[in-house]
From Swiss-Prot:
Protein name (record): Zinc finger MYM-type protein 4
Chain positions with N-acetylalanine modification: A2
Biological process, per Gene Ontology: cytoskeleton organization; regulation of cell morphogenesis
GO MF terms, alphabetically ordered: zinc ion binding
The organism's taxonomic lineage, starting at the top: Eukaryota, Metazoa, Chordata, Craniata, Vertebrata
Protein source organism: Mus musculus (Mouse)
PANTHER family tied to this protein: ZINC FINGER MYM-TYPE PROTEIN, ZINC FINGER MYM-TYPE PROTEIN 4
UniProt feature, compositional bias: Polar residues: 97-106, 280-290
Function: Plays a role in the regulation of cell morphology and cytoskeletal organization.
Zinc finger (MYM-type): 362-402, 414-457, 464-499, 510-544, 554-592, 600-631, 708-742, 749-788, 795-829
Region (Disordered): 83-108, 267-291, 1124-1185
Covalent cross-link Glycyl lysine isopeptide (Lys-Gly) (interchain with G-Cter in SUMO2) as placed by the record, residue numbers: 139, 148, 195, 201, 232, 250, 273, 289, 327, 400, 428, 430, 1035, 1062, 1081, 1128, 1432
Keyword Transcription: no
Taxonomy, superkingdom: Eukaryota
Length: 1549
């Protein structure tokens, strides 16, 4: 017995000094803990079970607040413990570490299984301990595998837990006595082993505690990383009973007072309140627990952990089995939980700001990591996120557009992309019932189909039967019926079936077909809407919906207003409602507003107390205090009266008992209501100009470091003008009044007008190239461009920072610059160069008001604190003395308030348990309603103890705004020596034009002296007299032709403007007069509707010095093309390849020209009726007016209708394909005109036979051209004059269609016209139909001579050449002398019906006269009349004039034809062009009767008064021009029409 006592004594001393053991193990196991965290093997299984003997109830409820049948942790256990969220919150497991019990036991078999396990473990542990003592102690310590952790996570479900804390204590006491008996029974040989066994158990507990604080991965469950007992299997189970022999344990003198102070007070632990877990437990309640101090914490969030965690662990240390082991062991200092950034994996330091996305659990160190993690730059979207519409089977790209619906027959929900698809699917699902009434089917009034009728509409006394919703919608649209239509989707609202939803917004009732449409309408409109109760303004998307008894949905700004509104509705109705406590039907006298906005009605205050006791049941004391959780307010309604809660007033309340906490709750409600009313009051700003108050978005002006606010744009502009708000314009460099200030690359630029701003942006675009035109976040222009796809839209940003901030703003994680709340920010404002974002208009007004007021306004927290202090002071004295202040109006991170008990463990420092305190960390809110605990003993002096002391820290931000004041001061400049002016007489004679002297003074006098000045007058006169007469004629002509003076003046103005523009541009030389004449762009201005000299400006090119000028411009074009290869890209080159395939003769629709033909025919008849009919037998030709092309094809050049515009890319592509084929065929790459090497074939010559190639070669060799080697170029603009001339000569002979067939002659002319237009479009002045290209014209004339117009089956003539094509490629007009001649030849052929050269040579100036006739309504018409010369009887029979009626020998006179003017387009008017032609001819030829077409001068300028010589034009040149004109379809139509009229007249005669 003495030996047993000797062994037991050291064991007790060891157990009493276990705190020193824990301290030393922490220091020596740091390296082990690190290695253990790195090498974790999850596949190991526990092999040692020796730890089940010494501490069988080690994880009892005092240790971890867990029972064997109840594994759900109380929220009080986790209060203050840092939470590390996992990636998937829905799959979080509540795991527990337990080294004894590995299975869940039921309530009935718990004690039996425990006893059996202890008996079996006693026998096994005795054998294992004996074997363990035989082994070497240091050798076991060297095993590396003992440091590998085994963690098994399992989900603990707490659903059937009904055991109270008192019941748990009884089980613990029973287990404790049984364990005491078993500990006293061991024989003497077990004492030493007990000491070793306990040593190992303590070491395992320390290792288990250290392992829980190791850094965890983001995927680890938060209970694994934060709670010390989160693992099912103990790590120490593999450690065994061995430690290193060199571990030294520090021994200190015993201190019983310290152990007594460390031990938790049993009375306080017995009164810990359980936290309700779910709605079922919350409604049924829990068993009673006494409570002395209650602490309600909504949520605590911290990055580096909470200081309450180690205190909580210390306060709940389990008591050991034996009396000697019943001392409380101090907890090991918890290792700081290391939280890592999910983006860059960096460890977040304590106090560092962390970012978290709404709805996600991942933490980030910065916004760059946040945006980079969520939106990877090259990460494709997962294919699993796409959903398919169940109706149309299309992919729904935007998740917000998904409409989920569940039908009766299926358990799964269906996804739809729109409401129409949902309706269509519902129609398909419904069974089709065919109703046969006397075998007659009913026809739908809309679609005219026989179907089942679903709608019958009585409209205008007619019943319309409709078969479907689609037909019903079409019927409503056709008749403009808008009854019962959904405001969101436009569908029909079936009000009779109760499916119609009514939303009361802005004083109007809007109807919706479903609740989804109501929500969608709120999100889309997002209007500022007043609350239905307090009338405070707020965005409709943020308000709370409530449907009243009438079915209308109203909007409320907060849960408080919704609760007050429901109380008002219940009390104002005066109906009996079932009490939520006693279930009796009576008029409610008390209402309890819950945190979710719902209302609980009670008939008496006792029912209120009974209802709250379901959640908080105090025992052992009769307290009159009813603790209120956050969000609960008791409203008392006096008997026989009702509370009014309209407008912004609060409902009338009266506390039943002055000593109850209901009075304090009502005081808090009143304080909160007053604060909300103050914060929601509309703030008005004062306009800086008109001094009026306004509540709209202000117009801001940043000038000289000050911000000026205006009510509108007009006031801002007027203020700038009055106060001379001027700055240097960034574009025009002139100091003017600022119109707008724009930010470019971080610098503000001022502009005087919108034009200057646009021009400056245009210049920047040329310099920068691809740049950010407008940053989506900071609204500035920057040369750097960063794009990101957000919400299906590509946004532009100027830098990474702006993209990061915009992403935070897009995902509604940014905070408002006004109210500092996080959420959707729909308003923005530019303030001092920065963009501020706000929730709504109220926040903008509040922000601007705060900036204008000198003293900063009180913050929300300060107002709330003041209100709550006043509320607390208004209560009874006893209540103020016993309770702590309540912190209100703080945004909570928890979804619902939860009352979480806790125990203060600072008794070691103070020696007594103080009142419960509150701690605010970050954005968390803490509310404390507690009673004063009984007084404790005075603190005692402690001796040499290391305590875990962590002060409660609080971060406080103070906003200090300095008072700014402007004061003008002046610094005196250093004084300079004063300069004294001393007059010194100087003997200088100064002549003064005054009569001060007696002698005469010379005065300058001007005498006009004639000086001869040489002048060069262009004239072809032979002698001086004729020259003088020519000068007089020119003077008279200029005086009598004012329109020509206008032409010359317009040409001079255009030349002067061009000179000024070239002078302003740097590096450009003056434009000479010859360059002005040759530059096409100078004169290609917009052609107006008046004459005003535009004909003169069209005169661009002349035939003088053609070869030199064309080579010069060809070389210049080559340089331009090399510098800018993208001058004219082949935009349509891929499509415009085969002209005849795209425009076949079969597709010609003569109806497209019907309008013009009818107009011409009517005009001809009208003019014929207006002319007096001659009495002679020969009928006079009617007037042929010019076809008003502008009415059909547009007034501007090149803007014709499809099918009427010249597609010049056909010619360019044909040239390109031909050159490619030519270069590929000829190895030398030389173009040889003539000889045997001119083998012609098509680009697709592979489909042709060798016989065709040989025939083409023979045909080309017969041309007789001199062989010249020319390198062909695909780009026609790069060809010189000679290359282009020879190339075109060969091109028209060898070009083929893509299928290898030859082009028709009209198609070849079409291709050549396209090439001509392409040259003009790109700045080349070459006219390929003039004398320098004579060889090409000869070959083209030969080719066109064999062409005859195609007669279609309907009788119309077909040709691909139209009149508009000649106007577009500048072959008609007044651009040059030869073009003007070609235009007159065209008009004479078309309207005078002159078909050959012989008939045209009969024209003369004497036979063509300009006449004017007055028509109806006093309108005048100018026309040209041509009188053909008399036919001589001896004229040869083969020279009969075609197109004119054959006359008998007794005819009196030939018939005169007329050509009317074109008033719609003066530039295409035949009369004006003829007058312009006369002005450019010599006076000597204007009365000649033998000539009409004159030879152009070799050298002339546009300002020259004469373009033509006195000699007639060569008949060969005239024939070449006429051949091309006869290819025009409109000419053949006019000739055919005139021929038919002549034949009709002959038949009538």
């Amino acid at each position: 017995m003495a030996e047993r006592e000797v062994e037991t004594g050291p064991r007790k001393r060891f157990e009493q000094k276990s705190d020193a053991v824990f301290d030393e193990i922490v220091e020596n196991c740091g390296v082990m803990d690190t290695e253990m965290s790195e090498d974790t093997d999850h596949n190991l299984t526990p092999t040692l079970a020796s730890m089940s003997y010494g501490m069988p109830n080690q994880t009892g409820s005092e240790n971890s607040l867990l029972d064997e049948d109840d594994y759900f942790l109380n929220s009080g256990d986790l209060a203050g413990i840092p939470v590390v969220s996992s990636d998937n919150e829905d799959e979080q497991d509540c795991s527990s570490k337990d080294n004894l019990v590995s299975s869940v036991h039921t309530d009935g078999s718990l004690e039996v299984e425990r006893r059996a396990a202890h008996q079996e473990s006693d026998n096994e542990n005795e054998i294992q301990i004996q074997n363990q003592l035989k082994k070497d102690f240091p050798k076991q310590f060297d095993q590396v595998s003992v440091f590998k952790s085994i963690r098994k996570d399992f989900c603990l479900v707490r659903e059937n837990s009904k055991e109270t804390f008192s019941g748990k204590e009884k089980n613990r006491d029973l287990t404790y006595h049984e364990r005491e008996k078993r500990l006293d029974k061991p024989h003497k040989g077990l004492d030493s082993r007990l000491k070793s066994s306990f040593f190992d158990k303590a070491a395992n507990q320390v290792e288990e505690t250290l392992h829980t604080h190791l850094p965890q991965n983001p995927e680890t469950n938060f209970r694994d990383s934060s709670y010390p007992f989160a693992s099912k299997e103990s790590i120490g189970s593999e450690l065994g009973n061995s430690f290193a022999s060199n571990i030294r344990i520090k021994e200190e003198p015993l201190d019983d007072e310290y152990d007594r102070a460390v031990a938790p007070q049993q009375g306080l632990l017995d009164r810990v309140k359980d936290e309700p877990d779910n709605a079922q437990e919350y409604s049924h309640g829990q068993q009673q627990k006494t409570q002395e101090g209650e602490l309600k914490i909504s949520a605590v969030f911290s990055v580096s952990g909470s200081p309450l965690a180690p205190q909580l662990t210390t306060g709940f240390q389990p008591s050991l089995a034996s009396p000697g082991m019943n001392k409380m062991l101090p907890s090991v200092p918890a290792t700081a939980v290391r939280v890592s950034c999910s983006g860059c994996k960096k460890i977040l330091q304590k106090g560092q700001t962390a970012y978290q996305r709404k709805g996600s659990t991942q933490l980030f160190c910065s916004t760059l990591c946040l945006t980079g993690y969520t939106v990877p730059p090259a990460r494709p979207p997962p294919p699993l996120t796409k959903k398919t519409c169940s109706s149309c089977s299309k992919d729904i790209l935007n998740p917000k557009d998904v409409i989920s619906a569940q039908f009766e027959n299926s358990t799964t929900s269906k996804d739809f992309c729109s409401q129409s698809c949902l309706s269509t699917y519902e129609l398909k699902k419904k069974p089709i019932v065919t109703i046969n009434t006397n075998s007659i089917s009913t026809k739908c009034s809309m679609c005219q189909k026989n179907a089942v009728i679903r709608h019958e509409v009585n409209y205008q006394n007619v019943v319309h039967k409709l078969c479907s919703d689609a037909c019903f919608s079409k019927f409503r649209s056709a008749n403009n019926l808008t009854m019962n239509c959904c405001e969101n989707c436009g569908g029909y609202c079936y009000s009779g079936s109760g499916q119609c939803h009514v939303l009361q917004i802005e004083g109007q009732s809007k109807k919706f077909c479903s609740s989804m449409c109501v929500t969608s309408y709120k999100q889309k409109s997002a209007k500022i809407t007043p609350c239905a109760l307090c009338k405070s303004l707020r965005s409709s998307a943020e308000m709370i919906e409530n449907t009243n008894s009438l079915g209308k949905t109203e909007l409320f700004c907060s849960v408080n207003c919704l609760s007050a509104y429901r109380v008002k509705m219940v009390t104002s109705a005066g109906v009996q409602v079932q009490c939520n406590s006693c279930k009796t039907s009576a008029i409610p006298q008390y209402h309890l507003a819950m945190s979710d906005g719902s209302i609980r009605n009670f008939c008496s205050y006792s029912c209120v107390v009974a209802f709250q006791n379901l959640f908080n049941k105090p025992t052992g004391m009769n307290s009159s205090v009813v603790p209120l959780s956050q969000g609960q307010v008791i409203v008392s309604i006096p008997t026989g009266s009702s509370a009014s809660a309209g407008g912004g007033s609060t409902p009338a309340v009266s506390p039943t008992s002055i000593n109850s906490s209901a009075a304090a709750g009502l005081q808090r409600l009143a304080a909160q209501s007053q604060h909300v009313g103050f914060a929601r009051s509309v703030v008005k700003l004062r306009c800086q100009h008109c001094n009026r108050l306004f509540a709209t978005k202000p117009e801001l002006l940043d000038y000289k470091g000050k911000m000026f606010q205006f009510c509108g744009k007009n006031c801002c502009d007027e203020y700038k003008k009055i106060n001379n708000v001027m700055a240097m314009c960034e574009y025009c460099k002139i100091e003017k009044i600022i119109k707008e200030t724009v930010r470019f690359s971080g610098a503000d630029k001022s502009f005087c007008s919108e034009g200057c701003k646009l021009l400056y942006k245009h210049d920047l675009g040329k310099r920068w190239g691809s740049h950010c035109k407008m940053c989506s976040y900071c609204l500035q222009t920057s040369p750097k461009l960063i794009q990101n796809n957000l919400g299906g839209k590509v946004e532009d940003f100027c830098c990474e920072e702006c993209m990061s901030k915009y992403t935070v703003l897009f995902y509604q994680m940014a905070k408002c610059d006004g109210c500092k709340r996080q959420g959707k920010l729909s308003e923005s404002l530019k303030w001092r160069g920065d963009i501020k974002h706000f929730c709504n208009l109220l926040c903008i007004l509040m922000f601007c008001h705060q900036q204008t007021v000198c003293d900063p306004p009180l913050q929300n927290n300060a107002v709330a604190s003041i209100s709550m202090v006043q509320a607390a002071s208004a209560g009874p004295p006893s209540l103020r003395k016993d309770s702590t202040p309540v912190i209100a109006n703080v945004v909570s991170l928890a979804s619902a308030p939860a009352a979480q008990p806790t125990a203060n463990t600072n008794s070691v420092l103070q020696g007594a348990v103080p009142t419960v305190t509150a701690k605010i960390i970050g954005d968390a809110s803490t509310q404390t309603d507690a009673l004063k605990l009984p007084p404790s003993q005075p603190p005692r002096l402690l001796k040499n103890k290391a305590l875990l002391c962590k002060p409660i820290t609080q971060t406080k931000a103070t906003s200090c705004k300095p008072h700014t004041q402007n004061k003008e001061c002046q610094t005196d400049t250093p004084s300079e020596p004063q300069v004294m002016v001393v007059p010194v007489p100087v003997p200088v004679f100064v002549p003064i034009p005054l009569h001060l002297y007696t002698q005469y003074t010379p005065v300058p006098f001007g005498i006009p002296v004639p000086m001869p000045v040489p002048m060069f007058i262009p004239s072809s006169m032979d002698n001086d007299e004729k020259a003088t007469e020519g000068i007089e004629d020119i003077k008279e002509k200029l005086a009598t032709h004012p329109f020509e003076a206008d032409l010359l003046e317009m040409a001079e103005m255009i030349a002067e403007d061009e000179e000024k523009e070239k002078t302003l541009s740097q590096g450009e030389s003056q434009t000479s007069e010859q360059e002005l004449f040759l530059d096409t762009k100078i004169f290609e201005k917009d052609q107006g509707s008046t004459y005003s000299g535009d004909l003169e400006s069209e005169a661009v090119s002349t035939p003088h010095s053609w070869e030199e000028e064309l080579n010069h411009y060809a070389l210049k074009s080559n340089a331009v093309q090399d510098a800018d290869s993208e001058l004219k890209p082949f935009s349509k080159g891929e499509t415009e390849q085969d002209l005849e395939a795209d425009f076949p003769s079969e597709s010609f629709d003569p109806l497209n020209k019907g309008q013009g033909i009818q107009a011409r025919s009517r005009t001809r008849r009208r003019h014929r009726d207006g002319f007096p009919q001659p009495r002679r037998r020969g009928r006079k030709k009617s007037v042929v007016p010019v076809e008003p092309r502008s009415l059909i094809q547009g007034a501007l050049q090149g803007c014709s209708v499809s099918g009427m515009t010249l597609k010049y890319m056909y010619g360019v592509n044909a040239w390109k394909n031909w050159v490619q084929w030519k270069n590929a065929k000829d190895e030398q790459g030389d173009l040889k005109c003539g000889g045997g090497e001119l083998a012609s074939a098509s680009p697709c010559s592979d489909s042709l036979g060798s016989a065709q190639d040989h025939a083409l070669s023979q045909e080309s060799s017969e041309q007789g051209c001199k062989a010249r080697s020319v390198k062909l170029k695909e780009d026609i603009l790069s060809c010189t004059f000679s290359e282009l001339s020879l190339g075109l000569c060969q091109f028209i002979q060898e070009v083929r269609r893509p299928n290898g067939e030859k082009y028709d002659p009209d198609s070849i002319l079409y291709l050549c016209l396209g090439i001509q237009q392409y040259l003009f479009e790109n700045g080349r002045i070459d006219n390929i139909f003039t004398e320098p290209y004579s060889r090409f014209m000869i070959e083209l004339t030969k080719l066109l001579k064999i062409w005859e117009p195609t007669i279609l089956p309907n009788g119309y003539m077909f040709s691909r050449i139209e009149e508009e094509h000649l106007w577009e490629c500048k072959q008609l007009g007044a651009y040059s002398p030869i073009v003007l001649l070609n235009t007159l030849l065209f008009f004479n052929t078309k309207y005078f019906q002159l078909r050959n050269v012989t008939e045209h040579l009969k024209l003369s100036f004497a036979h063509v006269m300009r006449r004017t006739r007055t028509l109806k309504y006093s309108t005048k018409m100018t026309y040209l009349r041509f009188f053909p010369p008399l036919q001589k009887p001896e004229s040869e029979p083969d020279k009969v004039t075609i197109g004119k009626r054959k006359r008998n020998e007794d005819d009196e006179a030939p018939v005169g034809v007329e050509m009317a003017e074109n008033t719609d387009n003066p530039l295409r008017c035949p009369v004006r062009l003829y007058e312009f032609y006369l002005s450019k001819c010599s006076e000597s030829v204007k009365q000649r009767s033998d000539v009409f077409y004159l030879q152009p001068e070799r050298s002339c300028v546009p300002n020259s008064p004469m373009w033509y010589s006195t000699f007639p034009i060569d008949p060969g040149t005239l024939d070449t021009m006429l051949t091309r004109i006869l290819m025009v379809r409109e000419v053949h139509e006019e000739l055919a029409k005139a021929k038919s009229e002549d034949s009709d007249a002959e038949l009538s005669d």
